């Protein structure tokens, strides 16, 4: 049982780290298709989505 709690604590600590390379750009959007050309212009890759009215791009 101690091993389970140890693994659980390690998992929680690792999940708190920001390991992703996502980039928020200051572009307003109403849907994810609006972000694709803006992400292509900003980071060179058309991979992103609209979150809370702002574009989030993934390199």
From Swiss-Prot:
Gene3D superfamilies: Knottin, scorpion toxin-like
Keywords in alphabetical order: Disulfide bond, Ion channel impairing toxin, Neurotoxin, Potassium channel impairing toxin, Secreted, Signal, Toxin, Voltage-gated potassium channel impairing toxin
Record-marked site positions (Basic residue of the functional dyad): 49
Site location (Aromatic residue of the functional dyad): 58
Family annotation (InterPro entries): Scorpion_toxin-like_sf, Scorpion_toxinS_K_inh
Domain of life: Eukaryota
Signal peptide region: 1-22
Cellular component GO terms, alphabetical: extracellular region
Disulfide bonds: 29-50, 35-55, 39-57
SUPFAM superfamilies: Scorpion toxin-like
Location of the protein in the cell: Secreted
Domain note: Has the structural arrangement of an alpha-helix connected to a beta-sheet by disulfide bonds (CSalpha/beta).
Protein name as annotated: Putative potassium channel toxin Ts23
UniProt source species: Tityus serrulatus
């Amino acid at each position: 049982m101690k091993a389970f709690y140890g693994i659980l604590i390690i998992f929680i600590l690792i999940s708190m780290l920001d390991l992703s390379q996502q980039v928020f750009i200051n572009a307003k959007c109403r849907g994810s298709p609006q972000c694709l050309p803006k992400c292509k212009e900003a980071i060179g890759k058309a991979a992103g989505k609209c979150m809370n009215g702002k574009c989030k791009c993934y390199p």
